[in-house]
């Protein structure tokens, strides 16, 4: 499958990124889109983000514009509400500043097959990033429930995935079928779609692993006084500050595991 570029040589593009998350929503997708948009802009591309409205200010980056659209504040249903408003904004944007490629961040935007086809015909080819799937998450919730994980039933978002994940999967299926290219964030994510969905026979899917923020996810520098003091303060706050732990020895009487939701 080929892209229908407007010229034979593309030096720079106007990329419209349709992402339900963008800072100040620093979730997994929001963080990735923020950094990806910045890198694309540094390479000379013009990037426009279409995301959900937020009361807090959006961080600015050179070469990156951010457009906000309204959305229904309801679990799962927000993906369809946001998707409709994002499509309207995408049409308006294309009239003002022609778009060369549309990048959708699934599953947080729900478009129908008809809408994907319209975008491809009237605006630009669509590249869909596969950031996991609703069915995959639903099956994960079921597995957690079988292991008596009570939080599965207490979180309204997880409960919505359990009850409506199958319904909203049809929008992901539309994206898989009608995008020029699908980009899975991992081999396991690609296998997830191959197992639970129906990719076309000539499915153009590439796996591009998401990067890691090396400034955050790195071994601690215990020779740096401020970092060591912060490390000790964290340990002390959880009453896990025996001498072995503070000296970062492999064996400690107070092992500490932090489970952080992102």
Question: Which residues does each predicted region cover?
Answer:
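Short His-centered aromatic/hydrophobic patch
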Residues: 104-110, 130
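Membrane-proximal helix-turn-helix segments that form the acceptor-binding/catalytic region
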Residues: 150-182
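Short hydrophobic "strand-cap" motifs at the C-terminus of beta-strands
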Residues: 18-20, 185, 208-211, 248-250, ...
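N-terminal subdomain of nucleotide-sugar transferases
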Residues: 3-56, 62, 95-97, 122
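Active-site proximal beta-strand in glycosyltransferases
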Residues: 15, 101, 117-156, 183, ...
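A short, charged, and often flexible helix/loop element on the N-terminal side
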Residues: 63-94, 153-164
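Carbohydrate-associated surface elements
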Residues: 53, 188, 211
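Acidic anion/phosphate-binding donor-loop and adjacent secondary structure
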Residues: 194, 211-241
């Amino acid at each position: 499958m080929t892209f229908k570029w407007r010229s034979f040589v593309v030096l720079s593009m106007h990329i419209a990124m349709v992402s339900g998350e963008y800072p100040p929503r620093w979730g997994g997708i929001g963080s990735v889109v923020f950094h990806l948009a910045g890198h694309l802009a540094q390479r000379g591309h013009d990037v426009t983000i279409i995301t959900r409205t937020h009361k807090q200010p959006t961080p600015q980056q050179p070469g990156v514009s951010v457009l906000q659209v309204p959305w229904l504040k309801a679990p799962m249903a927000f993906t369809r509400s946001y998707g409709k408003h994002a499509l309207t904004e995408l049409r308006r944007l294309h009239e003002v500043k022609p778009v060369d490629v549309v990048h959708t961040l699934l599953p947080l935007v729900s478009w129908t097959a008809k809408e994907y086809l319209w975008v491809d015909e009237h605006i630009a080819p669509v590249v869909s990033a596969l950031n996991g799937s609703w069915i995959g998450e639903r099956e994960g919730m079921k597995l957690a429930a079988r292991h008596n994980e009570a939080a599965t039933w207490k979180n309204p978002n997880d409960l919505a995935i359990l009850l409506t994940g199958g319904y909203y999967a049809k929008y992901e299926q539309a994206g898989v079928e009608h995008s020029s290219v699908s980009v899975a964030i991992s081999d396991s994510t690609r296998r997830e779609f191959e197992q639970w969905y129906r990719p076309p026979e000539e499915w153009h899917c590439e796996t591009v692993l998401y990067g890691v923020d090396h400034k955050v996810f790195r071994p601690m520098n215990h020779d740096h006084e401020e970092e060591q003091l912060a490390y000790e303060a964290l340990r002390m706050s959880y009453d896990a500050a025996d001498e072995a732990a503070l000296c970062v020895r492999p064996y400690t009487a107070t092992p500490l595991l932090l489970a952080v939701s992102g």
